[in-house]
Amino acid sequence: MSPESRKLLNIVILGVGFMFMFTAFQTSGNVAQTVISSLNSTSFHGSGYTSLAIIYSVFSASNLIAPSVIAVLGCQMSMFLSGLLYSAYIAMFIQPYTWSFYTLSVLIGIAAAVLWTAQGCCLTINSDERTIGRHSGIFWALLQFSMLFGNLYIYLAWKGEINISDTDRRTVFIALTVISLVGSVLFFLIRTPDSDSAQEDEASDSVADAEGSMSAQGCLSKAMDAFRKSLKLSITKEMLLLSILVAYTGLELTFYSGVYGTCIGSMNVFGTDAKSLIGLSGIFVGLGEVLGGGLFGLLGKNNYFGRNPVVILGVVVHFLAFYMIYLYMPSDAPIASRSGTDLSAFINPSKTLALACSFLLGLGDSCYNTQMLSILGSLYPDNSAPAFAVFKFVQSVSAAVAFFYSNYLLLHWQLLILVIFGFFGTISFFFVEWGLTQRSLYNSM
């Protein structure tokens, strides 16, 4: 197998592993608040929004140490151990207790930081300037198939259900736990690519497992060096500009993965289908993600226009979705009580309109995330782990803030925040992309 084919295979395995893990985790996140509201146990007093806020708060702080962990453990072991904690969090829903719910929310925040930083490192090591766009799209498309499978089951199993029974909850989360474990094991199939340059020789050190006779002092030195690189990289001009758009991706991640599905489920106008529509909404978000990731993956190798047109498509698609959501969804939908909301907005809601907005949210998200993965890999090929750690740090901080305010803000205020960050984040991305293009032209002269 040629070196390029081996790298492509690694990307496919990486994407499939994440697909299994996040089939379980994203489905859990989409239905967490609904499941918790339906719990019969009087001893459980958790909040899905609060749990997600804890996850992303810890996630953001843990990104500062994630490169150090990866420098010591290597990418494969880091992703595997993180996957085990993801599985433990999902398994907790089989028989939830308030203490285990919030404890595992903290642990999975740490695991997420290590997992996503290792993913960015693995993606960069298996790519170059010519293939980074294609590989980012392929990985993103495979990852977002996770939005389809779990949510399809939720839709079929919970169709017509108003409250989720203990039996249904246990059945779903046992299956999701097994699926998550399968994804974790797949990471061991990734092989370190053959190095064809000094740059890859250096980068491959962060992918190989930390085996052999590395001393404790050597581990500490390696960890501290990775930490210092993260701090230095976080204050570069390019990273500061990109941070605005990165913050937006965190805000809209919260919206489509946690808030929007809950809003649909709280609308009494949808009747007995409201709960099953949560799963169907997740499916349509996934369809948009897969379409975008697949399309940009195919175009990535032959994209002569750069990343800006894709980001423009993302902002147009998202703003259209926000406008339609504002028109049809009642303002109290995100904070409605267990009995739901009977309020109306400006136009009559319909299932078709709700699912169309779900699709647009997914398509727009794929536009932003594929291009962020691509531009970070191009800007920081020698410092991929610190770069992706900073990316995930900013994204998770904004996601945590969004999960906190989702408990209190009416829908129209949440949409306004998204529009403001989306607009200015897109402008900042343009400046970084133009600077990178000029640098590439200068180096080619």
UniProtKB/Swiss-Prot annotation:
One of its GO terms (cellular component) is membrane. It is found in: Membrane. Keywords: Glycoprotein, Membrane, Transmembrane, Transmembrane helix. The keyword Translocase does not apply. CDD domains: MFS_MFSD11. The chain crosses the membrane at residues 8-28, 52-72, 74-94, 98-118, 138-158, 170-190, 239-259, 277-297, 309-329, 343-363, 385-405, 415-435. It is a multi-pass membrane protein. Glycans are attached at N40, N163. Belongs to the unc-93 family. This is UNC93-like protein MFSD11. It comes from Xenopus laevis (African clawed frog).
